Amino acid sequence: MKTKTNKPLIVMAVTFLLIVVVFFISLNLGVIKIAPLKTLQVFFGQGTARDELVLFEFRLPRIILSLLVGAGISVAGAILQSVSQNELAEPGILGINAGGSLAVVLFIYFFQGSASDLSFFGTFMLPFSALAGAILAAFLIYILAWKKGVTPIRLILVGIGVNAGFNALLLIFQLKMDPHDFMQAAVWISGSIWGANWNMIWAILPWIVILLLFTLYKARYLNIMQLGDQLATGLGTAVEKERRILLLAAVTLAASCVAAAGGIAFLGLIAPHVARRLTGPRHQTLIPVSAFIGSFLFLLADTLARNVLAPSEIPVGLVISVLGAPYFIYLLMKAN
């Protein structure tokens, strides 16, 4: 009994150690390689100006953003799977990411003029624009999937359709951009945190931290929802009210991550599933473990994306998709 109680803590401790290892590897690797000893010297204020620039202005913001986005997307996926009672639910598959991406591209196209020169104000407005698009996508999916209730398979099929529609609109507005912005938007939509900076971190940090804490606070309702709507209602839970609140939290988390990293598919599917297998379905432990696993997977994928074809770079979203697509197919076959 004691081992079962301690298992989530053990999983989080091991995952944290893995994050620390990849953190330092990611700091050292890149087009400009910095030896571990020199990295420590920089942190103690004894490094060269070049090493300080590379670490503090390029690599460290990117690593921190990877950890935040990985945690946010993974917890959003865990919420969606529980709220919809559908183990295949995930922000990318359901079209929520595509809605947020479309809103961000529209914001840049109409108000900022260039994807490469966002103002300080524009950077902080990105999560709000992504949230508007993600909420619109979620609303459309919920309305179109409703037919005397929402079945899991209908939710997935409608989500795929909405996803395709938003992606078509994305392409239309991309084609109206100049060639440089078109390429940047295409890479970003594929999932990329190239060009991560401290402004972007400060823009999404409050959203992700507050919503993670809020989700932990609401974990007991996610546990009850797993029992089914009738039993949950019998236990005195306002099921529809709590479902809408938690759905909004998941959409907002996903939108914040879209604003920072574009469309990241499958991470919100993989991390909660791995966490559930390791620690069980209790959301008081499932949520933090999902966040840890998601952060680790995203940071690992981004480190690979930066270095496998260096000096060229692969969008991190493509790396995650290569890993996640087979797992999604496996779950589909398992669910029959």
From Swiss-Prot:
Originating organism: Bacillus subtilis (strain 168)
Major site of localization recorded for this protein: membrane
Cellular localization per UniProt: Cell membrane
UniProt GO BP: siderophore-dependent iron import into cell
Top-level taxon: Bacteria
InterPro entries: ABC_BtuC-like (IPR037294), ABC_transptr_permease_BtuC (IPR000522)
SUPFAM superfamilies from the UniProt entry: ABC transporter involved in vitamin B12 uptake, BtuC (SSF81345)
Gene name as annotated: fhuG
Membrane topology: Multi-pass membrane protein
Keywords: Cell membrane, Ion transport, Iron, Iron transport, Membrane, Transmembrane, Transmembrane helix, Transport
Transmembrane segments: 9-29, 63-83, 91-111, 124-144, 155-175, 193-213, 245-265, 285-305, 313-333
Pfam families named in the record: FecCD
Keyword Nucleotide-binding applies: no
Protein name: Iron(3+)-hydroxamate import system permease protein FhuG
Function: Part of the ABC transporter complex FhuBGCD involved in iron(3+)-hydroxamate import. Responsible for the translocation of the substrate across the membrane.
